Design a protein with these regions (language model features):
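N-terminal carbohydrate-binding accessory modules
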Residues: 1-48, 78, 84-86
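Aromatic-lined substrate-binding rim segments of carbohydrate-active enzymes
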Residues: 34-109
């Protein structure tokens, strides 16, 4: 496993490392588009992809989890690794203004 350190700059396995990241949200693309989209990101010189985990989509009803098709983040993460990219996962419960209620599921209000 690679060793990542933060000193005066980032280091990966003892060498200075710059994170060049672009955001590609797996849940906004059909899985058939993931590979080409990630390929294009890498072709532009990026080495990292960033994505949210939208709780409201993965658990729309309390206790009912969804992780198939466009929501199959495990398959997306494996593809990112297969393509030689690094991944920044943002499993935050709040996704700014991009989703109603910040991406939190509405059932939390009950």
């Amino acid at each position: 496993m690679a060793k990542f350190e933060i000193k005066e700059e980032f280091y990966l396995d003892g060498k200075p490392f710059k994170i060049l990241s672009g955001a590609i949200q797996y849940f906004r693309l059909h899985p058939d588009q993931w590979r080409d989209t990630l390929y294009n990101l890498k072709a532009l010189g990026f080495n990292t992809v960033e994505t949210y985990i939208p709780w409201a989509l993965h658990e729309p009803q309390e206790g009912q989890f969804q992780a198939e098709g466009m929501l199959d983040f495990e398959a997306y993460f494996k593809l990112v690794e297969e393509m030689g990219l690094y991944l920044i996962v943002r499993p935050t419960p709040y996704i700014c203004a991009e989703f109603d209620f910040g991406g939190l599921p509405a059932w939390l209000l009950r």
